[in-house]
Amino acid sequence: PHQLVESFKSTLDEVREADILLHIVDISHPNFEEQIEIVNKTLAEIDGLDKPTVMVFNKIDAFNYEPKEEDDLNARTSLNNSLEDWKRTWMGKAEHSIFISTLKKENWPEFRELIYEEVKQIHSKRFPYNNYLY
């Protein structure tokens, strides 16, 4: 939440030391898009946007939406998007994003592989002649 950001800025300064950021999003929260925006603004304020970031959309098991009836003439809102709809947006198309359920371990092997590949890439750049680990 934005009201807590100021008190946590010193903690968030650790972002500058990180090699990779995991941006964990509670996709079941009705305002998750706003929360993403707040995190991105905060990262920009502390010069943290230049870090490799993996977007992790968690709690897919708890995700709910309001299906839009075919005869409903009201404008479609983000509340009408199914999980599959969200996966067809930038959220699912981004190279470094994944939809998971930590509770039910859905897409857990894919998540682990994604993190492994990201760390491997960073390690290979930092230590180019030390690839025996992979």
Language-model features: locations:
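Short, solvent-exposed loop/turn segments at secondary-structure boundaries
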Residues: 1-4, 33-34
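C-terminal-of-GTPase-core extension/linker across diverse P-loop GTPases
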Residues: 30-134
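Inter-motif core of Ras-like GTPase G domains
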Residues: 4-29, 41-49, 101
